Amino acid sequence: MKAKLLVLLCALSATDADTICIGYHANNSTDTVDTVLEKNVTVTHSVNLLEDSHNGKLCRLKGIAPLQLGKCSIAGWILGNPECESLFSKKSWSYIAETPNSENGTCYPGYFADYEELREQLSSVSSFERFEIFPKERSWPKHNITRGVTASCSHKGKSSFYRNLLWLTEKNGSYPNLSKSYVNNKEKEVLVLWGVHHPSNIEDQKTIYRKENAYVSVVSSNYNRRFTPEIAKRPKVRGQEGRINYYWTLLEPGDTIIFEANGNLIAPWYAFALSRGFGSGIITSNASMDECDTKCQTPQGAINSSLPFQNVHPVTIGECPKYVRSTKLRMVTGLRNIPSIQSRGLFGAIAGFIEGGWTGMIDGWYGYHHQNEQGSGYAADQKSTQNAINGITNKVNSVIEKMNTQFTAVGKEFNKLEKRMENLNKKVDDGFLDIWTYNAELLVLLENERTLDFHDSNVKNLYEKVKSQLKNNAKEIGNGCFEFYHKCNNECMESVKNGTYDYPKYSEESKLNREKIDGVKLESMGVYQILAIYSTVASSLVLLVSLGAISFWMCSNGSLQCRICI
């Protein structure tokens, strides 16, 4: 019995066996990603694919300053509103910036025909040559060119008029019929603008043009219109009951434009030879101009980013990330970040069998922790880590390259009568935007799922690599760990890690230790059986003695009567 108890004590005493464990890296990162199956998975490393910041400024685009219209609108600038005089010297720009509520547009009230189409045309223009299409001093000798001014277009407190148009009036009591032509010899498209005056009453018509009935005719290869003034009293706008309607056309190289009129013509003075440039555009923004450079400009501000997506603004100019409605697009590159909880021990499970990562292993993603008589330590498996890094890096770069198509996305122009078309266009744009957003989010979710599964697989492979080497020279003790049946010094540990473990060398020692341990288990089972029998017999005897004592006491005091019948 003493011998058996000694064996039991030996079995219950702790033994310091050499161990090696497979694990993975963990750190203090708080990055979270989403996958197809999970949300907010904490990971060790990730990359952001979504730009959500801007500088709040208008910047030079690729070193070229924008044309900032300030208080002027496109109409005021291109017609030559005298309050926009500072803009007339601008010949080139990277893009045009207009404020939402421009004060200086058409100073003389009236309708600007096809204004939205003109804006669309100008959005692709990066420079122009402003030139006199009909020189003021010699083109109209039979008409007055100085009295055509108005208080509604005042400048510095004096009546004035557009700087790119001439209001022709009667001279010496007459307004002779006029015919003027221009041949486009600029080898570029030429933008020509003019107007037709509609007086508020017949008296003004006679006073200004010396006739009641007048017409204006404009003809080119692609344009042919005849205008008749509409004389009618109208509500005052900017102090005027009359109106001027504004028109424009693009004259192709070599084409001729002919103006004929016997009154009411607001004649072209300056025209524009257009140079179109890829990447130009018009944005509506309240942002201020700053001394900065960018490759991507939005109405909110400049974006300087190489990321494939942005959620700053759908309207962009330059080389810009694609706009999506997402609030988060983060792609995982590392592993699930689950640092080991000390109370559970060092290890715990990725891939279902290691519960936590190691913050102590900093030189790789996957690796080993060993413990023997010489000490303990971490070591990364450099080969599997490097292969994983290369594979994931190539995948991330491929995703960014495929999705990082640079865009210029400008708003489309519609007039008030095209509201239904504008609404339809918005629905179409919203549909495309939803598709882009869905595709981007789904791509990231799928790739995140694949990356985390890839890491799990790598840890499993490393575990199986060790298991296949050790065979029955060690036993699996859970949590990714093996306990050797033999002594394994640092040299032995290193051979396991690099795949050169000599199984036969340690087989005999392992076999003997396995047999000893199995013997201890058998002896332990015998001891446990003896203890169990002893415990059962002792308990029964105590129960019988207790029952007899109670019965004797109850018989002695009369509580229990005992009769023996023969």
From Swiss-Prot:
Annotated lipid attachment (S-palmitoyl cysteine): 555, 562, 565
Annotated site (Cleavage): 344-345
Signal peptide limits: 1-17
Glycosylated residues in this chain: 27-28, 40, 104, 144, 172, 177, 286, 304, 498
GO molecular-function term, one example from the UniProt record: host cell surface receptor binding
Lineage: Viruses, Riboviria, Orthornavirae, Negarnaviricota, Polyploviricotina
Post-translational modification: Palmitoylated. In natural infection, inactive HA is matured into HA1 and HA2 outside the cell by one or more trypsin-like, arginine-specific endoprotease secreted by the bronchial epithelial cells. One identified protease that may be involved in this process is secreted in lungs by club cells.
Protein name stated in the entry: Hemagglutinin
Record membrane topology: Single-pass type I membrane protein
Assigned GO CC terms: host cell plasma membrane; membrane; viral envelope; virion membrane
Quaternary structure note: Homotrimer of disulfide-linked HA1-HA2. Interacts with human CACNA1C.
Entry-linked InterPro entries: Capsid_hemagglutn, Hemagglutn_HA1_a/b_dom_sf, Hemagglutn_influenz_A, Hemagglutn_influenz_A/B
Disulfide bonds: 21-481, 59-292, 72-84, 107-153, 296-320, 488-492
Residue spans, topological domain Extracellular: 18-529
Organism of derivation: Influenza A virus (strain A/Brazil/11/1978 H1N1)
Record's function text: Binds to sialic acid-containing receptors on the cell surface, bringing about the attachment of the virus particle to the cell. This attachment induces virion internalization either through clathrin-dependent endocytosis or through clathrin- and caveolin-independent pathway. Plays a major role in the determination of host range restriction and virulence. Class I viral fusion protein. Responsible for penetration of the virus into the cell cytoplasm by mediating the fusion of the membrane of the endocytosed virus particle with the endosomal membrane.
Keyword Protein biosynthesis included in the entry's annotation: no
Additional record remark: Major glycoprotein, comprises over 80% of the envelope proteins present in virus particle.
Recorded family membership: Belongs to the influenza viruses hemagglutinin family.
